[in-house]
Amino acid sequence: MVVSVQEIGQRAKTAATDVAGLTITTRNDLLRQMSQALLDNQSAIMAANKEDIAAYANTLSQPMIKRLTLDQPTIKAIATSLLAVVALPDPLAGPFDTWQTHVDLKIVKRVVPLGVVAMIYEARPNVTIDAAALTLKSGNAVILRGGKEAIHSNTVLANILRDVLRDNALNPDIIQLITDTSHESVNVLLNMRDYVDVLIPRGSAKFIDFVVANATVPVIETGAGNTHIFVDQSADQKQAIAIIHNAKTQKPAVCNAAEKLLVHVAIAAEFIPKITEKLVRAHVELRGDQASHQLDPRISLASEQDWDTEYNDLIMGIKIVSGTNDAIDWINNHTTHHSETIISKSSENVAQFMNQVDAAVVYQNASSRFTDGFEFGFGAEIGISTQKLHARGPMGLPALTTIKYEVFGQGQIRE
């Protein structure tokens, strides 16, 4: 029986009370069992995943197909990531701030779950597991709504996790998947203020903008990464080439991959042919401004739209800038506030870049590919927030909690 999105919300609200009451011992034990259940059901997972890939093999890019694929090494890595979440501290544990007021009221500032967390995401079935693990560990119920491209994979994964809850005589609706992949299901979810405490979208900039513009439930913006690398005049060019190559080509379809390259004019004539050669060999299509195109004809002319596009593919934009001020101004006009990088030996320029670039994560001399919950030591991540309220940057367990004030008295009344 297909359950309506509204009914899923109602069930999640009930389940939120159930999961909030679980001890950390129980939550961790469930995660261990879920990890093993994924390993025990690899054949079913891969069979479902093959259905998804077969359905979209001709419409998705190769990087997107790679994100969609669940093979044995990937499933093992996902199962291992659950054990990494087990090893993390309980986000709901104390010590809590406690104080006495002037009328001898005792106030305790507790950390508590958000309640019902809804996730909307595109063709990344690993997010199903990451989101379920982090919400369970932090005492939340979760509603998952993945993209149609991964519906078979997500359904099998969610059922495996729900079966573990059932096997432990717990409410399986602590973890729910919306199997209706229509736009209408998204529209309903965006407006379930009575049931959803926070909505976290993961996907393209266009998709996230749609969610923010149309949701009445609280939203944490995540993910879109029109990420820049600025190569300063003082940069170690060999180091810069290695960083750019890694940030662009290692996993081009993820939000922390580099999309744009800014090069200081003083080194452009020397550096641009070098980086062009390296990237062209890696099958990266280059689109640049007139100045970079003149330095190397392998760089085609970029359109105005290119500068604001997150490619999620082996494509990169290149622009020559006059210096640090110019780079900062350009980035702040085109950034999605995710991750931005400067490659420089100048402490003055680095300090200015770090201070003035408006992004959740700012790097010196390192690949933006490290913007990741696991790499930051948070375990898995629920997403990478590009906004400033509640959470910013890679969101681990603390981002899935809020506070509650408990006040203890002995009959006090306010005069």
From Swiss-Prot:
Q: What is its EC number?
A: 1.2.1.41
Q: In which pathway does it act?
A: Amino-acid biosynthesis; L-proline biosynthesis; L-glutamate 5-semialdehyde from L-glutamate: step 2/2
Cellular component annotations (GO), alphabetically ordered: cytoplasm
Compartments (UniProt record): Cytoplasm
Domain of life according to the entry: Bacteria
| Similarity section | Belongs to the gamma-glutamyl phosphate reductase family.
- Record's function text: Catalyzes the NADPH-dependent reduction of L-glutamate 5-phosphate into L-glutamate 5-semialdehyde and phosphate. The product spontaneously undergoes cyclization to form 1-pyrroline-5-carboxylate.
**Name the UniProt record assigns to this protein:** Gamma-glutamyl phosphate reductase
Q: Which species expresses this protein natively?
A: Leuconostoc citreum (strain KM20)
